[in-house]
């Protein structure tokens, strides 16, 4: 066997601008075809009952594809609701002109956040009696009723009302 040196050092000084020559899109890129989103939603929607709601989840800026753009095509395809992860995402989408119901999938724990949610015509996800009581107090204070989504923990033990106690808590 030959005796080789294993720790050779490459002289990068000979190539001072080699990083600038690398195209970041060289190996990975994405092209969003709105018509494909619309067609996919329409196909999925066709498999559902006419009375069934269809929510397009567009969190993380439409999974990096522009939430407004993805939302527009999903709505054209028949999405009746949209879902986002955070209050800020919901506000941004609503202020972009989207009129459909928008559900905030993440929890809103404070009265302030819930008021902001309702003022922006967004629907919060509620997963505790405490949050229900806050919503009830806000509704009484403003003399209004607000739509909301109740999250029930059906086994993942993450968020939501405990399944076994859910009915008891609302009697």
Residue locations for each model-derived region?
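Conserved PLP-enzyme active-site core in the AAT-like
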Residues: 47
